[in-house]
Amino acid sequence: MTPDEIAATYNAIAEHWDSSDFNRDNGIAQHERALRFVAKAGSALDVGCGSSGRIIELLLTRKFAVEGLDISPEMLARARRRHPQVTFHLADICTFSLPKRYDFISAWDSIWHVPLAQQLDVLRKLLAGLSPGGVIIFTAGGTQAPEQVTNPCLGQPLYHASAGIPAILRTLEEGGCACRHLEYDQYPERHVTLIAQRL
């Protein structure tokens, strides 16, 4: 699926993240773990922020100056209504130029929708966008080798890809970052949380 097709899928299912069916605790414990590695609150970017606002709310309570980015206009419209004081970017992370370096970047359940051929380049971009000592948390498919698949999600097609854990770890090292945490947090599902820090 192309980025435009991913945006169309999320436009169609955007209301799910505002419904009682969505677990607003999803990913929060993992973010709290990642935030322990941050020396002090500064600037933060939520990549693929979606509409729920739960990660943005957590970062605001920790006194971060937060920005959000999403490719779905409908998701972002809902996010803006929830947090009108936050700067949001309607953009494709594949082509978006980060306007500055950040002390914390979240890419929770988002960059695995990036086309496989571009995935490691996007990760390199995010790593380069970290301030010294900055921390990133992101999710990936827990595969050894590159894989991609399109499956139904809430009645819509949704693409996921993984460059493979070995390639991701090499990219972290090459990008001047240390892996601080790697966890198959929904085992036996292949959902992996990674936390890395710029050295």
Where are these regions (language model features)?
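Class I (Rossmann-like) S-adenosyl-L-methionine-dependent methyltransferase catalytic domain
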Residues: 1-43, 50-100, 117-121, 125, ...
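A conserved beta-strand element that flanks and buttresses the S-adenosyl-L-methionine
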Residues: 106-107
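Hydrophobic adenine-recognition pocket in adenosine-nucleotide-binding enzymes
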Residues: 110
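Helix-to-beta-strand junctions that scaffold the AdoMet/dcAdoMet cofactor pocket
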Residues: 114-116, 130-131
